[in-house]
Amino acid sequence: MCILVREFNRKEEKYQNRWRIAFILCMVLGCLPKAVYFPMILSCLILGKEKFYSKKDAWIFKGIIVVVCFALLASFLLPVLSSPEQSSDTRGGDTNGASQLSYILKQPFAYVVVLGKNVIDTLQDSFMGPKALNSFAYLGDGKYSALCAAFLTGVALTDTYGDKQTKKKTLDISTRIAFLIVFIVTIVFIWTALYISFTEVAEEIIQGVQARYYLPFSFFVYLCIQNKNLKNTISLEKYQLCIMTISNAILFREIGQIVLVNKCL
């Protein structure tokens, strides 16, 4: 996805073959462990015609992307459809992939309500909560998640430097909307996968979804809130020094509390 952002920011350059291959390989390798992220590869379909050498070149590349996307989708769906029982995870309790899938197909509107409620209720924690920003795994969560969230949002809004390239470096409205649509579709697949494999049949609380599942695309959500009209007049060196100082201060404070105070004293 970083390769894709690079291409969006370099509108005057052509999308070179080496970067196309690198993008596809990275997406395929990244999706193999969890194929639910496959919709993210479709983000490159919104690249403008100016990024390609010809109209034919654009159609060929985007056709390859669609084929790869369907292949990743098949790797996700075929095991569930061919052997739903094998897709169940007993750690979720009395799960049954076949029965859960049947329930979704028979009660699609009921499932949409369940899905929407679970996503909305956990959205803030998934992007800005302790599990997303300052989790120390088995050691526990930090106490300054609100501060981390405010700091991260501030960086997203001020990371413009006020130079002549600011307007080129920020994403246009259509690109932001396309990114957000792709991310919403990805979120739907993440929750649906866990509903089928990790949640008991017809339960209204979907189990197993963790904040870390949002990490592959959370960075790009922050890119979508940047404002090209907001100028940062601080020099690059001073700005980066300020960011690193605040980041380390928060990190060391959390480590001191969680590791030294809670575990050593």
Task: Mark where each language-model region is.
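Transmembrane helical bundles and short interhelical boundary loops of multi-pass, membrane-embedded
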Residues: 47, 72, 84, 235-265
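Hydrophobic/aromatic-rich transmembrane helices and adjacent perimembrane loops
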Residues: 1, 203-225
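Membrane-interface alpha helices of multi-pass inner-membrane proteins
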Residues: 18-35, 40-46
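Hydrophobic alpha-helical membrane-interfacial segments at the cytosolic entry of transmembrane helices
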Residues: 21-27, 54-78, 177-185, 242-246
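Membrane-interface helix-loop-helix junctions at transmembrane boundaries of multi-pass membrane enzymes
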Residues: 15, 52-61, 157-184
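Membrane-lumen/periplasm interface segments of specific transmembrane helices
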Residues: 35-163
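Membrane-interface transmembrane helices that cradle and orient dolichyl/undecaprenyl
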Residues: 1-18
